Amino acid sequence: MSAQREKFFRMPKLKPFHAPDGWHSPGYLPHFDGGEIPQFITFRLADSLPQALLDKWREQLRSDDCYDDAALRKRIELYLDQGYGECHLRDPRVAQSIQNSLLFFDQDRYRLSAWVVMPNHVHMLLTPGPDQDLSAILHSLKSYTANEANKLIGRTGQFWQPESFDRWIRDADHFAKVIAYIENNPVKARLCTKPEDWPFSSAWFRKRGGK
């Protein structure tokens, strides 16, 4: 692996261990804009979850007393891995276009440490660059990839669900676990037998020396 690609997968230097400032809630998911702190991001296709589940999700988020973020995330991940919806990202042209877009701003707007493009969702582990706003990064990325994907498959209309999940990385152990989770997602979803066999992922990319 080249020195540049090796640097690409190193753990960023974390700030002191504490829950950082920067939380906001523009929709019905809490989000975190915390500067140069690694973030685990998930965004998904507009039709990737049943409406009944979305309604239940919104209701849970209205009640601070009963909302269990970890349990809700686990249930949503389970639904995503079942491949609900049209799964436009199964099209290799679309998946490759999205992967290219993720890599385009690496080392510029953010530092990308891991990613995977699944049939109906995308996982990323990134660290925003200096003075880069996470919400702006995701808005730009999702807007561009939606337009390109719609062109490739000859459709119009909403492509991504507006809301995204983001979770800040606590420490080096958490960082390593998130990379493993992201890269094993295709195996867990029974799309391949080894992480490096999935072509739209950091595992595949790293196995081939970052080429």
Identify the residue ranges that each predicted region occupies:
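Short catalytic/metal-binding and nucleic-acid-binding patches
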Residues: M1-K211
